[in-house]
Regions:
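Short proline/glycine-enriched turn/loop segments at secondary-structure junctions
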Residues: 141, 189-195
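A short hydrophobic beta-strand segment most commonly corresponding to one strand
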Residues: 149-155, 179-181, 196-213
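A short beta-strand-loop-beta hairpin characteristic of the jelly-roll/cupin
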Residues: 151-175
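Non-heme Fe(II)/2-oxoglutarate
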Residues: 1-115
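A short glycine-rich, His/Asp/Glu-containing loop-to-beta-strand
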Residues: 110-133
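A short beta-loop-beta micro-motif enriched in histidine and acidic residues
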Residues: 115-117, 132-151, 167
Length: 219
């Protein structure tokens, strides 16, 4: 949660981040992303419905810790301030989200074995931008945030015009089935779609368990 001394979410998270914030420095892929492995896609038959049934989301409606859960007012004001102060619309659509998880993906979520798991599918349509930020996931385990994991399963292949930036590294050419994570507490990141196809990603966030570790070891 944003503290009273900060008006900006970006300034708040940057104040404790260990990232270098040197725009001249070149970040390698392995510096900013942990590529955990690859699984064979089993969800192709569900993709059309996933995209069709996704709904537009803003910072306010993204689901703070689950579907329909709004962020604390002080957090939202600080997040929208970061957008507004650079001349953009604080109510802009940052992505589409689908909270209806098909059986093919529920099986994957079960394999991860995260406690208090939030599962959502990001469908970033052409023209949508999720502005630069650092995640604030401490709410999942305030007593020990190191136990919190955020994982991504790419549901579609990368297409030209789709951008995912971690630190100073522009990540592209992922394949459906790629699984990754990153240092969510410190790594600035953003996404955008300037292409011709939706970018579809299954995101899982929760508390890491022994089952999680065992599953990741099999990848």
């Amino acid at each position: 949660m944003i503290t009273d001394e900060f008006k900006s979410s970006w300034d708040f998270t940057k104040s404790y981040s260990t990232y270098h914030f040197d725009s001249v420095k070149i970040d390698r892929l392995e510096d900013v992303i942990d590529h955990l492995g690859h699984i064979e896609p089993t969800w192709q038959a569900d993709l059309e419905d996933i995209v069709a049934n996704s709904n537009p989301a803003t910072w306010e409606t993204r689901g703070y810790k689950g579907e329909g859960i709004p962020p604390p007012r002080e957090d939202l004001l600080a997040e929208e301030y970061d957008i507004e102060r650079v001349g953009a619309d604080p109510k802009m659509i940052i992505t589409h989200i689908n909270w209806r998880i098909p059986d093919s993906l529920q099986a994957i979520a079960a394999a991860f074995g995260l406690d208090d798991c939030m599962e959502r599918i990001h469908v970033q349509q052409p023209g949508e931008v999720w502005n630069l930020h650092i995640d604030k996931l401490q709410k999942w385990c305030p007593e020990d945030p190191s136990k919190i994991g955020r994982y991504f399963v790419q549901l579609t292949d990368w297409q030209p015009g789709q951008f995912w930036e971690y630190g100073n590294h522009h990540w592209n050419q992922w394949r459906a089935g790629d699984i990754s994570t990153f240092d969510w507490a410190n790594m600035p990141h953003s996404t955008a779609n300037a292409g011709h196809h939706p970018r579809v990603t299954f995101q899982l966030t929760g508390v890491i368990t022994e089952k999680t570790k065992a599953f990741l070891a099999t990848l």
